[in-house]
Each structure stands twice: as C-alpha cells, then as structure tokens.
Amino acid sequence: MMNRLLVFLMLGAAFMLVVSAIDQDANEDINKRGVPCLCDSDGPSVRGNTLSGIIWLAGCPSGWHNCKKHGPTIGWCCKQ
C-alpha cells in the first residue's frame, strides 16, 4: 500500500514538473491579450496554423476588425 502511494506521488510530481515546463511566453500572451481564435486568413484548420485573432465578447474595439465570417458562437474574432 505504501509503495503504491509513493509511486502515485512520484508520478504526480513528474506530471507537475512537465506541466510547469510548458512555454511560459505563450501563457503570458494569452493573459495579456485574451483568448486566441482562428481568423479566415489563418487557414481552414487550427492544426499547424497560428491563431492570429482574439475573442472579444462585446464586439471588436476601435482599431480592430472582425476577421471571421462565421462564428465563434460567443463574441467576435477580432484582429488588429
């Protein structure tokens, strides 16, 4: 029983180490700018494409434009 607990704790610690090593710059960009979204100019799929738009809930602010013809279902996908 104690061995299983020790293995579980070690796996948990390893998982936390991996998660904390994820690119912190990407997290800072999301915190500063909001949630990224896929503009029409980014391509048809999110796989391998950069998400150049930002979701705004109350419409695009001044200096930004809606960069997606359809969706997202909540808010607008805007690009500067």
Curated annotation (Swiss-Prot):
According to its UniProt record, where is this protein located? Secreted; Nematocyst
Q: Which positions carry the propeptide annotation?
A: 22-31
- Kindly list the residue ranges recorded as spanning the membrane: none
GO CC, any one term: extracellular region
The UniProt record lists the keyword DNA damage: no
Tissue expression remark: Expressed in gland cells and nematocytes.
Look up what happens after changing residue 51 to A.
209-fold decrease in binding affinity to cockroach sodium channels and correlated loss of toxicity to blowfly larvae
Annotated protein name in UniProt: Delta-actitoxin-Avd1c 1
